[in-house]
Regions:
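Extracellular/periplasmic carbohydrate-active domains that bind, remodel
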Residues: 1-150
Protein backbone atom coordinates (compact mmCIF):
# COMPACT_ATOMS: atom_id res chain seq x y z
CA UNK A 1 0.00 0.00 0.00
CA UNK A 2 1.39 3.39 -0.96
CA UNK A 3 0.54 6.90 0.13
CA UNK A 4 -0.21 9.97 -1.92
CA UNK A 5 1.61 13.23 -1.37
CA UNK A 6 -1.05 14.23 1.17
CA UNK A 7 -0.74 10.96 3.08
CA UNK A 8 -3.96 9.27 1.92
CA UNK A 9 -3.43 5.50 1.47
CA UNK A 10 -3.73 4.20 -2.07
CA UNK A 11 -3.34 0.74 -3.56
CA UNK A 12 -0.52 0.48 -6.05
CA UNK A 13 0.89 -2.09 -8.41
CA UNK A 14 4.27 -1.86 -10.06
CA UNK A 15 4.99 -3.73 -13.27
CA UNK A 16 8.47 -4.00 -14.74
CA UNK A 17 8.64 -5.08 -18.37
CA UNK A 18 11.86 -6.90 -19.12
CA UNK A 19 12.70 -8.75 -22.31
CA UNK A 20 12.88 -12.52 -22.22
CA UNK A 21 16.39 -13.75 -21.62
CA UNK A 22 17.67 -15.52 -24.69
CA UNK A 23 20.98 -16.53 -23.12
CA UNK A 24 19.68 -17.99 -19.85
CA UNK A 25 21.94 -20.86 -18.76
CA UNK A 26 20.49 -24.36 -18.61
CA UNK A 27 20.70 -26.14 -15.27
CA UNK A 28 21.72 -29.24 -17.21
CA UNK A 29 24.74 -27.63 -18.90
CA UNK A 30 28.15 -28.95 -17.95
CA UNK A 31 29.98 -26.17 -16.14
CA UNK A 32 26.86 -24.74 -14.48
CA UNK A 33 27.14 -24.91 -10.69
CA UNK A 34 23.75 -24.78 -8.97
CA UNK A 35 23.77 -22.86 -5.66
CA UNK A 36 20.95 -23.80 -3.27
CA UNK A 37 19.63 -21.30 -0.71
CA UNK A 38 21.71 -21.55 2.46
CA UNK A 39 24.70 -23.01 0.61
CA UNK A 40 28.02 -21.16 0.53
CA UNK A 41 28.76 -20.74 -3.18
CA UNK A 42 32.26 -21.64 -4.33
CA UNK A 43 34.29 -18.67 -5.49
CA UNK A 44 36.46 -20.82 -7.74
CA UNK A 45 36.22 -24.16 -9.45
CA UNK A 46 35.77 -25.93 -12.79
CA UNK A 47 32.40 -24.20 -13.40
CA UNK A 48 31.88 -21.33 -15.85
CA UNK A 49 28.45 -20.28 -14.52
CA UNK A 50 27.26 -19.90 -10.94
CA UNK A 51 23.45 -20.27 -11.00
CA UNK A 52 21.60 -19.13 -7.85
CA UNK A 53 18.54 -21.37 -7.50
CA UNK A 54 15.16 -19.88 -6.45
CA UNK A 55 15.11 -18.61 -2.88
CA UNK A 56 17.12 -16.36 -0.60
CA UNK A 57 20.92 -16.48 -0.63
CA UNK A 58 23.41 -14.68 1.62
CA UNK A 59 26.90 -14.35 0.14
CA UNK A 60 28.23 -11.84 2.68
CA UNK A 61 30.59 -8.97 1.97
CA UNK A 62 33.03 -9.18 -0.92
CA UNK A 63 32.14 -12.48 -2.57
CA UNK A 64 35.00 -12.97 -5.07
CA UNK A 65 34.11 -12.86 -8.75
CA UNK A 66 36.61 -13.82 -11.44
CA UNK A 67 37.41 -13.14 -15.08
CA UNK A 68 35.54 -15.17 -17.68
CA UNK A 69 32.92 -16.34 -15.17
CA UNK A 70 29.14 -15.84 -15.24
CA UNK A 71 26.85 -15.30 -12.24
CA UNK A 72 23.14 -15.84 -12.97
CA UNK A 73 20.37 -14.66 -10.62
CA UNK A 74 16.91 -15.73 -11.86
CA UNK A 75 13.81 -13.68 -11.08
CA UNK A 76 12.80 -15.90 -8.17
CA UNK A 77 16.15 -15.54 -6.38
CA UNK A 78 17.38 -12.85 -4.00
CA UNK A 79 21.11 -12.66 -3.30
CA UNK A 80 22.14 -10.56 -0.30
CA UNK A 81 25.73 -9.34 -0.18
CA UNK A 82 28.35 -7.75 -2.39
CA UNK A 83 30.55 -9.09 -5.18
CA UNK A 84 34.02 -7.88 -6.13
CA UNK A 85 37.33 -9.05 -7.53
CA UNK A 86 39.41 -7.97 -4.51
CA UNK A 87 40.94 -5.08 -6.47
CA UNK A 88 42.77 -7.50 -8.77
CA UNK A 89 42.95 -5.68 -12.11
CA UNK A 90 44.19 -8.86 -13.81
CA UNK A 91 41.08 -10.77 -12.67
CA UNK A 92 38.31 -8.33 -13.56
CA UNK A 93 37.58 -8.87 -17.23
CA UNK A 94 34.59 -10.47 -18.93
CA UNK A 95 32.57 -10.93 -15.73
CA UNK A 96 28.84 -11.28 -16.37
CA UNK A 97 26.33 -10.85 -13.52
CA UNK A 98 22.80 -11.00 -14.89
CA UNK A 99 19.24 -12.25 -14.58
CA UNK A 100 15.94 -10.80 -13.42
CA UNK A 101 16.67 -11.55 -9.75
CA UNK A 102 17.87 -9.22 -7.02
CA UNK A 103 21.38 -8.55 -5.79
CA UNK A 104 20.97 -6.49 -2.62
CA UNK A 105 23.14 -5.00 0.09
CA UNK A 106 20.14 -4.40 2.37
CA UNK A 107 21.32 -6.84 5.04
CA UNK A 108 24.75 -5.24 5.32
CA UNK A 109 25.48 -2.39 7.72
CA UNK A 110 26.61 0.88 6.22
CA UNK A 111 30.36 0.97 6.89
CA UNK A 112 30.14 4.44 8.47
CA UNK A 113 27.45 3.38 10.96
CA UNK A 114 28.26 -0.26 11.80
CA UNK A 115 28.58 -1.44 15.37
CA UNK A 116 31.27 -2.55 15.91
CA UNK A 117 32.92 -0.16 13.44
CA UNK A 118 34.21 -1.57 10.17
CA UNK A 119 37.92 -0.80 9.66
CA UNK A 120 38.50 2.02 7.18
CA UNK A 121 40.61 -0.20 4.92
CA UNK A 122 37.60 -2.55 4.49
CA UNK A 123 35.12 0.15 3.34
CA UNK A 124 35.86 -0.48 -0.34
CA UNK A 125 34.01 -3.81 -0.10
CA UNK A 126 30.79 -1.90 0.56
CA UNK A 127 31.04 0.64 -2.28
CA UNK A 128 28.59 0.65 -5.13
CA UNK A 129 29.52 -1.24 -8.26
CA UNK A 130 31.45 0.36 -11.09
CA UNK A 131 30.42 -0.91 -14.51
CA UNK A 132 32.49 -0.26 -17.59
CA UNK A 133 31.84 -1.15 -21.20
CA UNK A 134 28.07 -1.56 -20.92
CA UNK A 135 26.07 -1.56 -24.15
CA UNK A 136 22.61 0.00 -23.91
CA UNK A 137 20.37 -1.70 -26.43
CA UNK A 138 16.76 -1.27 -25.36
CA UNK A 139 14.41 0.85 -23.29
CA UNK A 140 14.68 -1.41 -20.22
CA UNK A 141 18.35 -0.44 -20.00
CA UNK A 142 17.67 3.30 -20.20
CA UNK A 143 18.56 5.37 -17.16
CA UNK A 144 16.37 8.33 -16.26
CA UNK A 145 17.53 10.88 -13.68
CA UNK A 146 15.74 14.18 -13.11
CA UNK A 147 13.76 13.59 -16.30
CA UNK A 148 16.95 13.35 -18.38
CA UNK A 149 17.65 10.16 -20.31
CA UNK A 150 21.15 8.68 -20.19
Amino acid sequence: MGKTQNGTPIHTITIFANPFLTNKPSLEDIGVYKVSPGEDPPSEGPWHTLYFLPGIHDIGVGFPVHSNKTYFIPGDAIVYGTMNNNKDDDDGNHILIYGHGTLSGDRLPHPNFADPPIPEDEHWKYHSITIQGVKRDNITNTYVFNNLEY
